[in-house]
Structures are given as structure tokens and as C-alpha cells.
Amino acid sequence: MLYKGDTLYLDWLEDGIAELVFDAPGSVNKLDTATVASLGQALEVLEKQHDLKGLLLRSNKAAFIVGADITEFLSLFLVPEEQLSQWLHFANSVFNRLEDLPVPTLAAVNGYALGGGCECVLATDYRLATPDLRIGLPETKLGIMPGFGGSVRLPRMLGADSALEIIAAGKDVGAEHALKIGLVDGVVKQEKLIEGAIAVLRQAITGDLDWRAKRQPKLEPLKLSKIEAAMSFTIAKGMVAQTAGKHYPAPMTAVKTIEAAARFGREEALNLENKSFVPLAHTNEARALVGIFLNDQYVKGKAKKLTKDIETPKQAAVLGAGIMGGGIAYQSAWKGVPVIMKDINDKSLNLGMTEAAKLLNKQLERGKIDGLKLAGVISTIHPTLDYAGFDRVDAVVEAVVENPKVKKAVLAETEQKVRPETVLASNTSTIPIGELASALERPENFCGMHFFNPVHRMPLVEIIRGEKSSDETIAKVVAWASKMGKTPIVVNDCPGFFVNRVLFPYFAGFSQLLRDGADFRKVDKVMEKQFGWPMGPAYLLDVVGIDTAHHAQAVMAAGFPQRMQKEYRDAIDALFDASRFGQKNGLGFWRYKEDSKGKPKKEEDAAVDDLLASVSQTKRDFSDDEIIARMMIPMINEVVRCLEEGIIASPAEADMALVYGLGFPPFHGGAFRWLDTQGSAKYLDMAQQYQHLGPLYEVPEGLRNKARHNEPYYPPVEPARPVGSLKTA
């Protein structure tokens, strides 16, 4: 053994070939600060070996290196800029030493090589991969850019266009594509990986392969003519401006850095990467996006822990077909859980099957599946008008009309047709689970399972624990949702649960703005372009359905009369009374026509202004800041109340529910991350300017306490240790 660290070791393999093996405690390898330091120490030993002829890098895990240790990011990002820059210089000196070894080097890559893992293998001369490879640089999705030389080496290896596509979009690619673009040199089966790697190294050692020529382009300026450079970087900047926009600075910074570094060799180019990385790491966007990643891990870990002793349903059923039922049936079948789809009429069943078939055909068109797979999935969705087969069902979700009487009747009837241990769930969006459970003989086997539309796209499923729901029932439904590829978050019961409970105060803020003379078009524009929502409130209401929102508004008002009972006729009432139900009938705040792809395209409709005039004061202009404050304060206050009342268990779960269920702008990180970034005291000062608008604008006492004591909602993060100690970690 030449060297042994906590996360990697170095040993002789054969005939002057050494192997450097990543083998961290736990299930995966991460390129954390300790591993970078250990890699430097291993290279120090290696540089003294006069008999060294070649070096093989490999992993003892199912994945090569899954990336940097993102749990370290928040503390690293708090380190002063100069100190972070010094540590990056140190880390890059380690990878440069790997790249500068006077012998051929090869990385044998299995499974994942992402972020720092990818940057590590870019420093070797050759790369062999297994068919399960996923390799790429996802840093821009975290609000940063590659910092270990990825933005320097990748363009010089692949050419500007392929590298820009991977880096700017934060992409990873599979083995076949990686081979095609030159990111790996060969793909071999796992059992042949080491044998193949040694064979390549031997060829390089004997001179049959020119490893020096392979290495040289990574040390030089990017080989691009002025015209080629202008085309590549102009197109890339245009694409990034269109897709990322101003709220996500990392992709544009990465492209501009690669452009600026193109005319330099490795050292100068790495300095430019360093100078771009450090300011990005100190942005609120990076902290928010890293926070989302960590919260996602927390939420998924919690679901995994909850279901570790639970068997996933092997046969499921959906009550109520149509678009929603068909979407749920598709998602279950697509992920391997066969489903019976029951309705009371053929028309709805046909609609549900058509929806499932449409979604499968899209997968076929994209090349994700073949005809055989499509037929196999669709055959596991069984449409029926009766309860045949329900005696074999492990889990049922009801997705009928949002009417408590109908839902109770359907659930009570179904309970008599299934086994005593079968779990029942309702896809209600607002009706309290306790109310629906009152119709059942076994309420302990019942809970809420709230999907979001469109089911196949929206990651969140709210699992609602009723007063009598058993732990086993919750765990079984969480297991089913996880199997469907969704992110389940357990919340406690109340009208609207968590997501809709906090959404309708936001809509109430919108209604009050329109009542006071705001133009809905400007409100939409400000909330989309300035705050960052994917849709403004008017557009969102049209997509949700004005009729659906009108009904839900009444349910929420009954549940929370003190705050949500309005004393005036609002825009939603006016549109509902005029049968303008939104996209579903082509008329809402906007008029909708199908575009060339058959998707609804919104257009202005002067008639809506006349309708809204009856529920609005004289038009007046509001500043962007005032619009954002009046829209967001009711939502933020309600989110805080839900945490204080135990409806949602933690800030992390609340923020992920908002991001995954409502599209809360990820660069803000969620409501609690946004609050922590603003500071509770600053938020309180802002909110108090609007408390005259009514109870929705009154800040909860818990938040006032946070402001008084300057306390954040997330645990405070301490800056990483000084860079000197990180080097020798």
C-alpha cells in the first residue's frame, strides 16, 4: 500500500501501473474538501515513485464519484471571497498535478461521475466507462459554475459547442452520447472495465497510443477561429438569455467565462474560472438553489425512512377517470404498478384511457420507449364500470368531482368492495380528510393523496394525515407515491391542507389589488418577470379554472372565516358569473386559442375589462414593489401559520411543497429561505405597511418573535474552517 486516506487509497496494480481507488465510508464517493486534500497527499507519494509507468483511477462503489459534497457548500459559500479563491487555487493545483504526471493516466468510470467527479476524470488522459455511465457538470443548476477546471478542460476536449451545451444547461449525458462527443474513449461492460483499462494503459506505455498528444489540447488555448468563436458564443449567450433569464446568473457567467478564457492556456483560463466562481458562490441564488437540493434530499430521505418496512402496492385502483384519473393511472402504470380505472360511464373511461395513451405516445415520439413498451404499459391499465378485481387491490385513490357528498358516497361504496387492509385515499384538493373519513367504517385506512395537474409533470404529492389515519396507511400511500416517481410530503389535515391553504391568500391579495384599481396584466407581468413565478396570478387562475377556484375559495372561506371570508364581490366572482372559466372554455382573464401545436395560447380580450370594472375602483398604477408585497405577504403569513400549527412539519418540507407544487421560484429557495434571506425584521417592517388591508396581512406572532430576536427559520450555518486547515483535512 503506497498511501491510505479516509476516502481513497493508492497501491501498485502491476508492472509499474498504480491504481488510485476512491473508497469513502458509506455508500457513495463524494469529492469533498477532505478527499481533495487526500488526493493531493496521494499524488505527493506518487510523484516520488521512479518506477511509475501509468496510473489508473477507479472506484470501489457502484458510482465513481457522485459529485462534490453539497452539504459543505453553504458553509464554504460563507467563507470570505479571498479565502474561497485560495482554496479553489489549492484544489486546482491538485488536479493540475494529476494532469501533469509524467505517465499516462486513465479513469475507469462506472455509474455517476458528476460535478467534481466529472472534473476529476477530465484531468486524466483517457476515460473508459461502463454502459450505466451518467457524466456531466450540473453546477449551474445550483447557482454556481464548475470550479475544478471543468469550464477549462471540457471545451478544449469536446469543442466549444458540445461543452457549452453541457455546462450552461447543467446537463449530464449517458455512455453512448459521451462516447459520441468524445467525453469518454470507450464503453465496456462492468466486468471488463479494469481489464480494458489496463490494456489501454499498456498501449499508452508502449507508445501505441500517444498520450502526450491526447493531453496537450487541454493545456493550450481553445482551437477556434474568430468567426467560429463569435458564432458559438453568440448563439450560446442568446440561448441562455432566453432560457435562464436574469434570475439565474450562473449559466451566463459560465458562458462568458469560457469565452474570455478561450484565448488562454490552462493556468490563465483556470484563474478566470476562479474569478467567476467565487462571486457566484456568494449570491443569494446559489444559497437558495443549494438549499433546494439539500431540502430535496431531506424530504426524500424522510419518505425512505418512513417506508423502509413497507411493501409498495402491487395493484392499485383509481376511482374517477377523465383527465386527472387518466393522468394518475398513467403515472402508476408507467412506474410499474398496474391500475384499475373505474368510472360510472364509458365517456369518462374513454377520456381517461385517451389521456394515458396520449402521454405514452409522447414518450414514443421522444424515443423514450418503443411500441412494445407502450403496449405493455397500456395493458396494465384496466378500465371498468364495476368493481371487478377490487378484491385484489392494495391501494385506491378517489379522483371524482370535488363535492363532499359525492366523494363520501363513492368512498363508502368502495370500502365495501375491497379487502379490510386495503388503503383508501382521496385526491381532494380542499375538502378536509376528517369530513370524508366520517363516511367510512375504517377511517384508519384512509388519508388524502393530493396530486397536482398535470400529474405527469408536477413532482409533488401531498399526503394528508387525517385525525384517524394510521401510520401504516400513511406509509403505504407514501410508498405508492414514491414508486410513481413523485415527491410525497406528509401534511396534517385542514381545509386546503398546505398548498391550497397558502395559495388562496395569494389569490385574495390579487383580488384586493384588482379591487383597488390594479391592472391584472401588470400584476401578472410583475409577478412573472420581477418575482419569478412561472405564471402570474391571472394566468394561473385561468389554468386552474375560474370555476374550480371559485368553489375552492368558498371552501377556504368556510374553513378560515376570520381571514379568508371576503366582504366584497371580486374578480373571480365576476368571471365565474359570466361563465368565463379559463382555459377550459377559452375565456377567463384572457381569451385562448389553439396554436399550431394544439396548445392554448393566451390573447388579450377587451371584454374582460368591462366585466372587471364592476368589481374595481378607478384604475391606478402600483409600483412593482407594492404589487409584490401585496401579493406575497398573505401567502408568506399563511405559510408561517401552517408551520406554527403543525400542518407542515418543517421549513424544508414547506419550501419543497411550494417549489414542487406551485412553482415557487427556485432561485428564492421557497418561502422560508426567502424570509431568511430578507431577514424577518425587514419582512415585518414591510408587512406592517399593509396591515390596514385586513387579517391576511397581519403577521403571525411566531414570525414577530423571530424578527425581535433576529432568528432565521433554517439552522444557522457556520463558515468553513480556514483554507489552510482545509488543505490538510
Swiss-Prot record:
Region (Disordered): 708-729
Family (UniProt): In the N-terminal section; belongs to the enoyl-CoA hydratase/isomerase family. In the C-terminal section; belongs to the 3-hydroxyacyl-CoA dehydrogenase family.
Pfam families: 3HCDH, 3HCDH_N, ECH_1
Listed transmembrane segments: none
PANTHER family listed in its UniProt record: TRIFUNCTIONAL ENZYME SUBUNIT ALPHA, TRIFUNCTIONAL ENZYME SUBUNIT ALPHA, MITOCHONDRIAL
Encoding gene per record: fadB
NCBIfam families per record: FadB, PRK11730.1
Annotated region (Enoyl-CoA hydratase/isomerase), positions in chain: 1-189
Any single GO CC term annotated in Swiss-Prot or TrEMBL for this entry: fatty acid beta-oxidation multienzyme complex
Protein name: Fatty acid oxidation complex subunit alpha
Binding site for substrate: 296, 500, 660
Active site (record annotation): 450 (for 3-hydroxyacyl-coa dehydrogenase activity)
PROSITE patterns on file: 3HCDH, ENOYL_COA_HYDRATASE
Catalysed reactions, semicolon-separated: a (3S)-3-hydroxyacyl-CoA + NAD(+) = a 3-oxoacyl-CoA + NADH + H(+); a (3S)-3-hydroxyacyl-CoA = a (2E)-enoyl-CoA + H2O; a 4-saturated-(3S)-3-hydroxyacyl-CoA = a (3E)-enoyl-CoA + H2O; (3S)-3-hydroxybutanoyl-CoA = (3R)-3-hydroxybutanoyl-CoA
Assembly and binders: Heterotetramer of two alpha chains (FadB) and two beta chains (FadA).
Function, in words: Involved in the aerobic and anaerobic degradation of long-chain fatty acids via beta-oxidation cycle. Catalyzes the formation of 3-oxoacyl-CoA from enoyl-CoA via L-3-hydroxyacyl-CoA. It can also use D-3-hydroxyacyl-CoA and cis-3-enoyl-CoA as substrate.
SUPFAM superfamilies linked: 6-phosphogluconate dehydrogenase C-terminal domain-like, ClpP/crotonase, NAD(P)-binding Rossmann-fold domains
Binding-site positions, NAD(+): 324, 343, 400-402, 407, 429, 453
Pathway noted in the entry: Lipid metabolism; fatty acid beta-oxidation
UniProt keyword terms in alphabetical order: Fatty acid metabolism, Isomerase, Lipid degradation, Lipid metabolism, Lyase, Multifunctional enzyme, NAD, Oxidoreductase
Site (Important for catalytic activity): 119, 139
Gene source species: Salmonella enteritidis PT4 (strain P125109)
Molecular function via GO: 3-hydroxybutyryl-CoA epimerase activity; delta(3)-delta(2)-enoyl-CoA isomerase activity; enoyl-CoA hydratase activity; long-chain-3-hydroxyacyl-CoA dehydrogenase activity; NAD+ binding
Chain spans, region 3-hydroxyacyl-CoA dehydrogenase: 311-729
